[in-house]
């Protein structure tokens, strides 16, 4: 764990989010086989696996873009696997996709516009907008059109907007993809700011080094199932995880 990254400590008493035996197939071909995991409030968890391992399918199943063939998805004690995307969002699931999902307006209005949909009091809308601009280092970009932002700046804006709906769980689909190493370190810092709000964080990635400095635990997907789980150091000792990434001939 890099010094200065951890913001709060999570309490591992009761999971805020659970996946139980989630299974998904396409045209009879299994993609996910009985996937199970728990997330706790304020915890940052990685979902690792090479391309084609099922990460994107699991991500889409959790947020409601597709439905599982079997299994349960539980948020704050309530089953949500049959709910569509908008109801899962309303229940407390926030998500950030790999697409550049911003409005064609200024950075300030990108945040304020969502605040206006979710907060009745105008003064509170303005206060939250300014707070998020400050916390995600966007004040100097407030009047810039979002379409003119760099990749890292867009990620910061998207992360800031996630917090407006007060999610209990945040899913981030490869948020550090195609970013320079120095920008990756910056985004890692802002991802962990979500913990200030008590969010449980699940981050997908296919690269170990993008996540291991910031996650508390990780799950590794391979062969349509979870082949390893644990702390970063435990994952690095897993023969199945090492073989998946480096091949059967690899030796530590």
Regions found by a protein language model. Name each.
Residues 145-149, 153:
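Conserved ABC ATPase signature
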Residues 27, 109-124, 135, 248-249:
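ABC-type ATPase nucleotide-binding domains, specifically the catalytic core motifs of the NBD
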Residues 63:
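Helix-to-loop junction immediately C-terminal to a conserved catalytic motif
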Residues 170-174:
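Catalytic Walker B motif of ABC-type/P-loop ATPase nucleotide-binding domains
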Residues 71-79, 91:
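Conserved ABC transporter NBD signature motif
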Residues 123-141, 189-192:
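Conserved ABC ATPase "signature" region
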Residues 48-50:
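The feature captures the beta-strand-to-loop junction immediately N-terminal to the Walker
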